[in-house]
Amino acid sequence: MLRLKCASQRYDWGKVGVNSIVYKLQVASENPDISHVDLPYAELWMGTHPSGSSCLWDNPHVTLAAHIQENPASLGKPSLIYFGRRLPFLFKVLSVAKALSIQAHPDKKMAVRLHAEQPDLYKDGSHKPEMAIALTDFEALLGFRPLNQILAFIQAFPELAELTTLELPSPEEKRDVQPPSIKQLYSNLMRSSPEKVESTIKSLLNRFTTGSKSVCDPPLSILGVDLQEEDVQALVDLFLRLTQAFPGDVGCLSIFFLNYIRLKSGEAIFLKANTPHAYLSGDCVECMANSDNVVRAGLTPKFKDVERLLEMLDYTPLTDSLRLGATQPIPTPEGISMKSFIPPVSEFAVDVIQFDAESRGFSLPSVPTASILLFLHGQGTITCPSTGEACSQETKFGPGFVYFVPADMIVNLVSKEDRKGSLHAFRAYVNRK
């Protein structure tokens, strides 16, 4: 078992300094690379991706990727057979102050094609399904709304009709016409000229801020859509925030096409390949296939690959529960909980371990593949009963400590008796047995 020194990413959408959980974890773990308190700290990366590879704490010149190449058995047989001599997931902590781009991650077939055609933009040929577990109140856009909701918004906000080139019947008309597809409507929106987009945004801003019109005309209730008034008002508030941060950006209008979801701490979402999404605010733990491929089309000053995004998106509306449920893999003593978030992919799964303030110890069951163990809160020591000795020279844990745990290793967590508060840890591992 090896302690890791992990990289931070300072994207401009991240929270700044002490407001960022990424910064606070790095400082608490005594990472010597963290010195600038006035910079954004957006992401903590734990894994082997070359854009931010972890290295060994006691020997920072050795990357985790190099260690795995020298010690492939540490990955475990199921992982070696399925993925070879590499760690197939990337584990992260995100601290979001400003909305990330409207984006999607390609499936394997598209990823190979993108990497072959534009390797400078798309760095690898891997797909990138991902999962986010909220640490604080967390906002996101995720997948397309049902078509009837999208059509209702277009009818309630006629300003959108011109961009989608949808000819709307009056409420008195009854026409037996085939409704347009989500792909047709969203493609028309995203291909609109910047001038038309800016004009539509200004018109909606006028509608939402002057009070001269009702917010929805006609009201959504007349249109037979199951959306509450508070849901519409939340969207209006989001629109006002986004237009301040990204004036004139077509992504501001995507909120009427995509599901707006607000997570509480401990709730999770799963994003399969080709699903449009954007993280808007809050803190989360994220796990994904080991790729950094992103196709963007809105809410960003970066390159927008609109045609590519429209080609690859999955336009199937997400009408089931948008949250990923958790299971409890083993019984736990009173005051201790362990939940597992198991997505429908092989690259990763995540356990969440929590002690209350009175609990002292817990034996974390082994998994047959390598794992990365992150401590968010709590202090104590780690021992490995398989050897009867300490796991390594450095066996303490505290906030921000990260460990690489070889396959099949049982880990005993012993909390410090005089610690303040509870223990909160996350374990990511390969979802193969």
Swiss-Prot record:
Residues that, per the record, bind Zn(2+): 103, 105, 130, 277
Cofactor binding remark: Binds 1 zinc ion per subunit.
Assigned keywords, A-Z: Cytoplasm, Isomerase, Metal-binding, Zinc
Primary site of residence: cytoplasm
InterPro entries for the chain: Man6P_Isoase-1, Mannose-6-P_Isomerase, Pmannose_isomerase-type1_CS, PMI_typeI_cat, PMI_typeI_hel, RmlC-like_jellyroll, RmlC_Cupin_sf
GO BP terms in the entry: carbohydrate metabolic process; GDP-mannose biosynthetic process
Enzyme class: isomerase
Localization annotation: Cytoplasm
Molecular function terms from GO: mannose-6-phosphate isomerase activity; zinc ion binding
Keyword Ribonucleoprotein: no
Cofactor(s) demanded: Zn(2+)
Domain of life of the source: Eukaryota
Biological or metabolic pathway of the protein: Nucleotide-sugar biosynthesis; GDP-alpha-D-mannose biosynthesis; alpha-D-mannose 1-phosphate from D-fructose 6-phosphate: step 1/2
Transmembrane segments: none
Active-site residues, record numbering mapped to chain: 296
General function of this protein: Involved in the synthesis of the GDP-mannose and dolichol-phosphate-mannose required for a number of critical mannosyl transfer reactions.
Similarity remark: Belongs to the mannose-6-phosphate isomerase type 1 family.
Name this protein carries in UniProt: Probable mannose-6-phosphate isomerase
